[in-house]
Curated annotation (Swiss-Prot):
NCBIfam families with a match to the protein in the record: PTS_HPr_family
CDD domains per UniProt: PTS-HPr_like
Protein name, UniProt field: Phosphocarrier protein HPr
GO cellular component, one term: cytoplasm
Keyword tRNA-binding annotated: no
Amino acid sequence: MPALEITIINKLGLHARAAAKFVGVAGRYPCQVRVGRNPESCVDGKSIMAVMMLAAGKGTNLHLHTEGEQEDEALNALVELINNRFDEGE
């Protein structure tokens, strides 16, 4: 089960469009994706409502972990999305 902590760096944080992109990437993989402000209270990373309820603004540290088939690929894709500022160019 790969896991890591990552900081939200885009200007608007994990707002609706960014959350939709996150869930879209997570949904491409068959593994379980969990995300949260701390490892003990992670939510389903494939649920748009759960991801939006994190209210993760710029500078928020999030814990990501994946488990199951293609877990490494899923984690890498989500890290790339976050590090690319959700492709919002800011």
